[in-house]
């Protein structure tokens, strides 16, 4: 997935969930949009180097968006969780998700379920069970362990219930955890953050719902991040 043209700055603070103040290399201060509703643990600290993009939209109050954080150890994390579905869509098209590579038809944002939900992707293929795929981001990393979620997610809990219902109706149901951080090679659910999500997903997996985690990798050109892709599945610790 190609990233938009990026410029760097220093994070001053994030506030009101969707806003951040940054200091430009010129010393000027600018407010930008933050498309992340999570806690952003470890990837949104004062003084962090961040990368932001610009939009030409005339309707946006804040035309710049926080895209990436570059950590002190050099690792990168895409904090714009809107990118996760773009990333997975490209990976599905390119048959990079081996567990789903047999599907040829990809339908994004399809209404389904009894709780008024939209599935991120509905996959279809001749002679195959329909496959409902819910995408979740991995931005929380400790050591080399990626975790999700980074905040309590009642929406995520609802999605697990909906997926289990689809499985019981005879379809495939998958939670795909997409790496937006390039510093992990193992994955587990952050049960200490959202024990209910952990419980629901474990119970769903016992009844046939599938869950996979994929690592992310950034491409760098002239010291500027230019692309992000999913590389390979990582060990899923249950």
UniProtKB/Swiss-Prot annotation:
It holds the Pfam family SfsA. It comes from the Bacteria. InterPro entries: SfsA, SfsA_C, SfsA_N. CDD domains: SfsA-like_bacterial. One of its GO terms (molecular function) is DNA binding. HAMAP family: SfsA. PANTHER family: SUGAR FERMENTATION STIMULATION PROTEIN A (PTHR30545:SF2). Belongs to the SfsA family. This is Sugar fermentation stimulation protein homolog. It comes from Haemophilus influenzae (strain ATCC 51907 / DSM 11121 / KW20 / Rd).
